[in-house]
């Protein structure tokens, strides 16, 4: 006959169960609530540490993950409610960053750019991308690369010839299929930077596709994109010495249907492989501003801008950002 467990054994088992439940609850609360009080990167680190600790016990880990997923539903709702708000879901010119003294600003049909005559690349290219525009398939890719006569001094086709670098779009041609003229103007060399082909057709294309995914899901995305020009000196191509950026960036902003403002930014080095994920290069808009020396989304009210640019919520953006 098997022995019945003693009262002491039952007490020990009961205590162990209580301790296990307490550990699960505390761990899940820490991981789920940290995004409400900490910057995104710090909150991610906290969750990673907690996951390593609870992962040492399979029972605790299983219960922790179930409770964490449940709690995250509530924290996402709270984050949405606490997101900085604006009165209108559309703000005219919101995508335009602060101008740089002495730099030409050019407005084309679908985008606006700030031209850096020293480096012969744009400081930034800004445009509004909508789901409606992406659904319009009226125009095929024109491929009419050419200098931009609207600036005092443009890069030239010969600068890229046999250079080993592709003419990398900043505002992608695919985002402008809604207009033959808008599409054609994306092939101005002022909208190009020298990019390695593996980069241009690799992770940079991933960034472009992710931006389109965001526009299709949210309806409208405000986009600013360009090369990082604060980490020179730069190697150059061609007789005109077009600067080869070491990395390129994007800053994105969405205003949701309730007026909540959501931002995310990224800066991606040219030596990144095709298989790398975007998530490694995501950052806050504040961090991108510190990196580039630019000031984005200045049409927002100061308090809204400060709150929106200080953090980002990866769960708000499509899975292609991960």
Describe the function of each predicted region:
Residues 2-322:
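Domain-level detector for secreted/extracellular nuclease and nuclease-toxin modules, and
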């Amino acid at each position: 006959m098997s022995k019945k467990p003693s009262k002491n054994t039952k007490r020990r088992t009961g205590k162990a169960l209580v301790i296990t439940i307490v550990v699960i609850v505390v761990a899940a609360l820490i991981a789920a609530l940290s995004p409400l009080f900490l910057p995104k990167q710090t909150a991610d680190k906290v969750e990673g540490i907690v996951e390593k600790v609870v992962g040492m016990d399979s029972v605790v880990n299983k219960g922790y993950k179930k409770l964490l997923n449940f709690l995250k539903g509530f924290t996402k709702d709270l984050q949405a409610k606490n997101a900085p708000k604006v009165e209108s879901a559309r703000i005219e010119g919101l995508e335009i960053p602060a101008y740089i003294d002495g730099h030409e600003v050019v407005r084309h049909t679908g985008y606006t750019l700030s031209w850096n005559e020293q480096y012969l690349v744009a400081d930034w290219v800004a445009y509004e991308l909508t789901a409606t525009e992406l659904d319009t398939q009226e125009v095929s890719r024109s491929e009419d690369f050419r200098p931009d006569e609207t600036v005092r001094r443009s890069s030239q086709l010969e600068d890229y010839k046999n250079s080993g670098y592709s003419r990398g779009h900043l505002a992608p041609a695919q985002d402008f299929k809604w207009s033959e003229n808008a599409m054609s103007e994306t092939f101005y060399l002022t909208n190009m930077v020298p990019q390695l082909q593996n980069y241009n057709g690799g992770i940079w294309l991933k960034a472009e596709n992710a931006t389109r995914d965001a526009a299709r899901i949210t309806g409208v995305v405000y986009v600013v994109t360009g090369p990082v020009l604060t980490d020179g000196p730069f190697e150059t191509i061609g007789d005109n010495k077009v600067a080869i950026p070491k990395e390129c960036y994007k800053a994105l902003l969405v205003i949701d249907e309730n007026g909540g403002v959501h931002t995310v930014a990224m800066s991606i080095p040219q030596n990144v492989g095709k298989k790398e994920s975007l998530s490694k290069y995501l950052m806050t808009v504040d961090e991108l501003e510190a990196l580039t020396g630019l000031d984005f989304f200045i049409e927002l009210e100061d308090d809204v801008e400060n709150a929106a640019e200080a953090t980002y919520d990866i769960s708000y953006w499509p899975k292609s950002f991960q």
